[in-house]
């Protein structure tokens, strides 16, 4: 059993969500008796150091989760880049942008030596990974720092791989989940399962605690996941409506009105498959486009579109990440959301 899971007052984890929160949300979740998560993929070393110092100073010793992406940054040749820019050129022209407006990188950092050095200094109780696990030499140092290692699996095969390669807890991510798919072995959407098919299969396959993730938006879903064998549940979209989240008003409004069919898995915003609320960009260019550069390279040009459109008050190119349970989410403080999700425990 995970010592961290056993220590929680509520078997609930706030999912890490890059851009959607700073330290205020995970701190509030921790104080409410659940496990708050800090998404580190968007932080450079100085900003991550400051965030970890805040978690240390204000966390009161409560456990929290520090999340990283474990991807390996790929290469793209000129032909691939030209094909992706051809998809985006009509939108660039519409907004008066040129290739010179594209930043040098996609903004999503893989776990690296700089992050490891900060982790060894601050020793977060839980370190979780998306897209598999980091290289064995890095992972061994994470474990040597005393951190529990959690990681996402979207299939039974991935769960077994994580168990064999050093994970302490498996997060079973159903197809309903908002944000990026954590897949790393089989990226075929046709092979992905909903949570309530995936969860019992993973629980049966591995000898590790399993956290259920995907479409968890109310107390009934929490209760059902625990009844199917989950040691805890992870909710993301529900916490996008928290008072402490950084979610934009337009994103909040879209979540409140979303039906399950209003979300889709798209690769347009980063090159990685991720579920969000369908917008103009997704309808016209996707939601999946074979010309999108591999994760995270597509995010540089897509991010330029987003930034300029939002500057004009337009959200046609904004990734409003949300799971299929979005419409069942209710706004409130993080403590209110924790209490609401755990009302049937």
Pin down the residues of each PLM region.
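Conserved active-site-proximal phosphate/metal-binding subdomains
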Residues: 180-185, 189-211, 216-345
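Active-site entrance/lid segments in N-terminal catalytic domains of soluble metabolic enzymes
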Residues: 1-205
């Amino acid at each position: 059993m995970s010592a961290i899971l056993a220590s929680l007052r509520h078997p609930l984890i706030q999912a890490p969500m890059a851009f959607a929160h700073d330290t205020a949300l995970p701190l509030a979740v921790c104080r409410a008796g659940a496990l708050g998560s800090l998404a580190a993929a968007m932080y450079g070393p100085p900003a991550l150091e400051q965030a970890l110092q805040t978690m240390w100073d204000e966390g009161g010793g409560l456990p929290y989760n520090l999340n990283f992406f474990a991807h390996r940054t790929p290469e793209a040749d000129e032909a691939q880049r030209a094909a992706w820019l051809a998809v985006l050129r009509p939108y660039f022209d519409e907004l008066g942008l040129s290739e010179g407006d594209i930043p040098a990188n996609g903004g999503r950092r893989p776990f690296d030596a700089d992050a490891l050095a900060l982790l060894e200094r601050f020793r977060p109780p839980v370190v979780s990974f998306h897209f598999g696990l980091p290289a064995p030499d890095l992972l061994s140092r994470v474990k040597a720092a005393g951190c529990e290692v959690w990681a996402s699996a979207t299939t039974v095969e991935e769960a077994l791989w994580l168990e064999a390669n050093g994970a302490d807890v498996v997060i079973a991510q159903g197809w309903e989940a908002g944000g990026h798919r954590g897949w790393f072995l089989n990226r075929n959407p046709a092979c992905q399962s909903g949570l309530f098919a995936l969860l019992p299969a993973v629980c049966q396959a591995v000898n590790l605690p399993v956290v259920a993730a995907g479409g968890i938006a109310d107390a009934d879903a929490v209760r059902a996941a625990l009844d199917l064998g989950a040691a805890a549940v992870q909710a993301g979209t529900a916490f996008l409506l928290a008072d402490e989240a950084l979610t934009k008003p337009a994103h909040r409004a879209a979540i409140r009105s979303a039906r399950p069919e209003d979300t889709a898995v798209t690769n347009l915003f980063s090159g990685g498959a991720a579920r969000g609320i369908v917008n103009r960009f997704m309808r016209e260019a996707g939601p999946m486009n074979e010309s999108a550069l591999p994760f995270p390279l597509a995010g540089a040009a897509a991010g330029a579109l987003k930034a300029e459109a939002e500057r004009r008050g337009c959200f046609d190119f904004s990734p409003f990440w949300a799971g299929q349970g979005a419409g069942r989410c209710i706004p409130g403080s993080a403590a209110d959301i924790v209490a609401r999700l755990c009302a049937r425990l």
